[in-house]
């Protein structure tokens, strides 16, 4: 399958243009999307995947957060627990509304792309994934986490989480979070 990166990039830009890029949160997600796509391609190249698969990994990065824009418009937050699953919203926009065809005509990779987008923010991937799908899910998840770590270091808390640094520092840590931390477990909300 041949992926036209210019077409996909234009489709994403056209979609994002419906949202206010002057808003720091919208701009953050536009920039994040392009960085994640580039990181996906870089990871795929480092694994010596064929060029078509490098392009497919890149496309998964372009697609993964399209639901964030509508989440932000409706709820003014990036926090899924306070709104909706942005991954599920991305799947709805792309596959339920058919916007995936704006990015590519060939439906041959739809199942893989849908799965990668759907599971990119989940705590764990389903065990039943085939090896190829699991690989693309892992590439996208790794690229997304790499850039999110960068965002959390470089971007003020107020721009991301609707809370001031001072308020966050004053807020208590619950016993459940402390227990998970000391037990070296993931803190789930």
Please give the residue ranges for each predicted region.
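Active-site flanking loop/helix segments enriched in acidic
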Residues: 9-35, 67-80
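Post-HEXXH active-site segment of zinc metalloproteases
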Residues: 73-88, 158-162
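Acidic/histidine metal-binding catalytic segments
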Residues: 48-59, 100-118, 132-139
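His-Asp-centered metal-binding catalytic motifs of divalent-metal-dependent phosphohydrolases/nucleases
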Residues: 54-79, 90, 111-123
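Short acidic (Asp/Glu) patches
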Residues: 96-102, 121-128
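An active-site-proximal "capping" alpha-helix that borders the catalytic cofactor pocket
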Residues: 35-43, 84-99
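Divalent metal-dependent phosphate-bond-processing catalytic cores, especially two-metal-ion Mg2+/Mn2+ enzymes
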Residues: 2-3, 25-30, 34, 38, ...
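All-alpha prenyltransferase/terpene-synthase fold signal
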Residues: 9-24, 45, 98-99, 104-108, ...
């Amino acid at each position: 399958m041949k992926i036209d990166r210019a077409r996909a990039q234009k489709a994403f830009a056209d979609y994002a243009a419906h949202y206010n890029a002057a808003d720091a949160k919208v701009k953050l997600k536009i920039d994040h999307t392009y960085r994640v796509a580039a990181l996906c391609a870089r990871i795929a190249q480092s694994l010596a995947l064929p060029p078509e698969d490098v392009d497919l990994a890149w496309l998964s990065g372009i697609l993964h957060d399209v639901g964030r824009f509508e989440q932000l418009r409706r709820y003014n937050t990036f926090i899924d627990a306070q709104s909706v699953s942005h991954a599920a919203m991305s799947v709805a926009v792309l596959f339920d509304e058919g916007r995936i065809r704006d990015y590519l005509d060939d439906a041959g990779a739809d199942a893989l792309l849908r799965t990668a987008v759907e599971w990119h923010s989940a705590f764990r991937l389903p065990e039943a994934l085939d090896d190829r799908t699991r690989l693309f899910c892992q590439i996208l998840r790794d690229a997304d986490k790499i850039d999110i770590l960068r965002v959390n270091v470089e971007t003020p808390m107020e721009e991301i989480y609707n809370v001031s640094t001072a308020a966050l520092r004053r807020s208590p840590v619950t016993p459940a979070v402390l227990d998970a931390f000391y037990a070296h477990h993931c803190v789930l909300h």
